[in-house]
Amino acid sequence: MFDGGVPEQIHRFIASPPPPPPLPPHQPAAERSLPFPVSFSSFNTNHQPQHMLSLDSRKIIHHHHHHHHHDIKDGGATTGEWIGQTDHDDSDNHHQHHHHHPWCSDEVLALLRFRSTVENWFPEFTWEHTSRKLAEVGFKRSPQECKEKFEEEERRYFNSNNNNNNNTNDHQHIGNYNNKGNNYRIFSEVEEFYHHGHDNEHVSSEVGDNQNKRTNLVEGKGNVGETVQDLMAEDKLRDQDQGQVEEASMENQRNSIEVGKVGNVEDDAKSSSSSSLMMIMKEKKRKKRKKEKERFGVLKGFCEGLVRNMIAQQEEMHKKLLEDMVKKEEEKIAREEAWKKQEIERVNKEVEIRAQEQAMASDRNTNIIKFISKFTDHDLDVVQNPTSPSQDSSSLALRKTQGRRKFQTSSSLLPQTLTPHNLLTIDKSLEPFSTKTLKPKNQNPKPPKSDDKSDLGKRWPKDEVLALINIRRSISNMNDDDHKDENSLSTSSKAVPLWERISKKMLEIGYKRSAKRCKEKWENINKYFRKTKDVNKKRPLDSRTCPYFHQLTALYSQPPTGTTATTATTATSARDLDTRPEENRVGSQDPDISVPMHVDGDGAGDKSNVQFSGFDLEF
């Protein structure tokens, strides 16, 4: 660039250039971002930017100074040196990345403007979009170049801020700021980019105050009137059409030399404006941090409320769960207690029942022991006191005559003694009787035989059954009489067993039955009688099942003192035997089962007959 030049020219380029013309007052931030209007088109030659015109004129001055340096005055030299210094700084900063294609100020401002309008969501897409926007306004740059240039301007901006903070009260601040005065417009654009969200009116008011201060300082000098007129002219030119923009820019170029004479005053105004901007930035940062803290506090309170509500719900659910568990456990315990009580009651009942059974068993055992002891004593008496056959025959004849008298006297009293009772018919198939042929009465009975095989399988006719009942009753009455009169027949009655005497009585009447058969028949009769007597039901007189029921009832219900009822029953039975058919006769069957013990009460003063396992127990 300086090939063929003089060393003095290099010295002049190194010298500090005058500051650029100040920004017009009350200029909005959106209008300060670019030196051309929004409707700018890079292909329209009639709308040439103001800054480009001034830059071209400066280049022309610089070119003229390059060839005719001996004809230029101090003001022109100063202007040429400022232009040269601007190009020199740009060439130093952009030498590495933009050696062949340097960035002009308009291009940098357009880059900052487009970059400030794009959100930094996707970096690569952002720089591609910025590159396309630059291409639309006539600047062809790649996304990588745009990114590198923006980062470079960003570093310069931060370096400028650091220098201003460190040298606020130092006189060197004016010189440092003058060295960066050529990039003032770019500095303001970068600052606008980093503080894009702030209020534009507040910034414009601060800038207006700074311009007022600067105007007051300029009025203290010699050329204050001219400067104010130029500033007012610039304000008017900004509102005019695009055709008048070129004339205003030329006037600014002519007046820039006069403005340079008051450079020191302008530097003071710029330093004060920059310090005020820094204070505004700090205040806005503080407010921003305060707002962020408030938002964070609101978010924190909201999250804490959610957590508290969730914890309260969890505690309530846990409490309900515990209550349900306690309730279930109490119900379970109550059920177990009720079950235990029921089991205890059941066990107690079983114990009571067992105690009763044991008492009954003990009573039964006691009765059996008494019977066995009495029976053994009875057998011993029979063995020790045998009687002669003559005595037996005489006693039997006497008793036979007494029985006949009783039978004759009681025949007239039979209708009065028989009364209806509550009876229940029993199936004859439950305990069938063994069949036997009916034998006529033997007027001349033969002596009984000792073997029992002769009467096996023979039926018991009804008259024979009635005879057995009457004989059993008569022997019981005779035993009572023997107890009253011990001197009469007590010795003979005790000498022979009960069923042996009954068998002999049956043989005298004409029925040949052994003592064992008589005993078995008597047990069967009592068994059927007990079954029918336990049921409280009326029983007809002509019932086929257990036809001797009424006789047994009358037998057990009559008083023991008299014998008229027995004879009457015998006479009635004899008459019934002649009138009833043959099929009504009841037989007997040998029972092989064990019959439980039963005590037959014949009335007050009568002996009890105990039947147990085929034995006739009397006590």
UniProtKB/Swiss-Prot annotation:
Query: Pfam families this protein is in?
Result: Myb_DNA-bind_4
Subcellular compartments? Nucleus
Map out region (Disordered) in residue numbers.
11-41, 62-100, 382-414, 434-458, 557-619
Per UniProt, the ranges with Basic and acidic residues bias are 448-458, 575-585
Q: Which stretches does UniProt call biased (Pro residues)?
A: 16-27
Which GO CC annotations does the UniProt entry carry?
nucleus
Query: In terms of one coarse class, where is the protein primarily found?
Result: nucleus
Q: Where is the composition biased (Polar residues)?
A: 384-396
Q: Which residues form a coiled coil?
A: 307-361
Taxonomically, the superkingdom here is Eukaryota
Biased composition, class Low complexity, residue ranges:
435-444, 561-574
> What GO biological process, any one, is recorded here?
regulation of DNA-templated transcription
Motif residue range(s): Nuclear localization signal: 503-510
In this chain the Myb-like domain maps to 102-154, 459-526
User: Keywords, A to Z?
Assistant: Coiled coil, DNA-binding, Nucleus, Repeat, Transcription, Transcription regulation
For molecular function, the Gene Ontology terms on record are: calmodulin binding; cis-regulatory region sequence-specific DNA binding; DNA-binding transcription factor activity
Its biological function? Probable transcription factor that binds specific DNA sequence.
The name of this protein is Trihelix transcription factor GTL2
Supply the source organism for this entry.
Arabidopsis thaliana
> Where is the organism placed in the taxonomic lineage, from the top?
Eukaryota, Viridiplantae, Streptophyta, Embryophyta, Tracheophyta
